[in-house]
């Protein structure tokens, strides 16, 4: 199975996804290689979503020699990808290789590191910009963020998505690495969300970072440390 259920989340099991994740986890991986790795990982995840979450239909096709039956993926015109700025940008770039006709939304949301994590394991979230396309009942909405840590940011983003007038056919949360705490928080905030991650790591540290994780994905992708 390309995507396996693990409790409240699902894991992308493709060998190339695990290979790319291992490469970008490495502290020695430099900025360009890290960013390109996130792009490749997004592309692999996109193909696995197509294989594991989208339906196909048979259709007649005329070849140069005869008529035969072929198979097409349904719903490729009805995909919305939401980029959670900024870390998701290279991840989304890869997803767009798999979904070139997807409509795109952008939400600039980040946690307040100075305020710190409260006793419930949550961060206050600052949302500075939201631009979403119209969402229809036929859509598959993919919210992409490489790191699902405390789940505070994703729960806030989901509030914006679900406040739209129309409920999409499928609502997917896609991450490269997730913490158990974040999965629980997102599942409680939006039970209908289908959480998909390449890896589910051990825990969060006292600062709310995923362990073993891969560091700050945004800083590593954009070399802002």
From Swiss-Prot:
Binding site for 5-phospho-alpha-D-ribose 1-diphosphate: 86, 111, 145-153, 216
Binding site for GTP: 36-40
Keywords annotated in UniProt: Allosteric enzyme, Glycosyltransferase, GTP-binding, Magnesium, Nucleotide-binding, Transferase
Catalytic EC class: transferase
One Gene Ontology term of the molecular function aspect: magnesium ion binding
UniProt cross-references to CDD domains, sorted A to Z: PRTases_typeI
Binding sites annotated in the UniProt record for uracil: 210, 215-217
Required cofactor(s): Mg(2+)
SUPFAM superfamilies found in the cross-reference section: PRTase-like
BP terms from Gene Ontology: UMP salvage; uracil salvage
Protein task: Catalyzes the conversion of uracil and 5-phospho-alpha-D-ribose 1-diphosphate (PRPP) to UMP and diphosphate.
Family: Belongs to the UPRTase family.
HAMAP family the record matches: Upp_A
Protein name in UniProt: Uracil phosphoribosyltransferase
